Amino acid sequence: INGHIELGVMGCPNLPRDVSQPKPKDGDIRHSSMEGLGVLFVAARGHGAFVAPINDTEAPLEPIHMRELEGDFTRATFCESVEAGHSSLGTNARIAQILGMGDQHVRMDSQAKYASISRGDGDVYLRLPVGDGSYQEKIWDHASGSLLVAEAGGTVSDLAGRPLNFGLGRVLSANKGVVACQSNMHARVIEAVASALKEEGRSSLLSV
């Protein structure tokens, strides 16, 4: 409504309900290997973020929150794309170094990254433009996930810290890249992003 996402629903059929449970290997479709998989995420602006098993219509929605790190980046982990063509993983690594983060990262594709950090599986999600940065993000790739993170205690913005503008059509034409993390860590992540892009001579990505 007026460029703001009011309701977000995401179904992640291959995401373990318990983060400590290993995901089955590709091609393994035995019933036993699929038990415990499938999570439904729901967020409503001003009302919080919730989760339930995707295959249990009677299960109540349980509230979720981002992991509380109290600004300690040494305990934080990245949640980033598997495919290098989707985000600049090398720049991610440099940002992690600037922030003093370790090298333990969670890698997955799709909007499941938003879902993952919203319940504390990871802490920082960056989607940094590759190449000349001409690619424009599609709104459907970020709408539900951005609200989910916001309602779980996080902040989602572009690389320069601007809110994502969903009111300009099919793409986020007023934004470059995505930064999502806990609200009390967001300003520091934005500073690290700017520093890393400056080192690479790509500071132009901070303007649209």
Predicted region positions:
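Glycine-rich active-site/cofactor-binding loop and its immediate structural neighborhood
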Residues: 1-7
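An extended, acidic
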Residues: 14-17, 24-47, 53-208
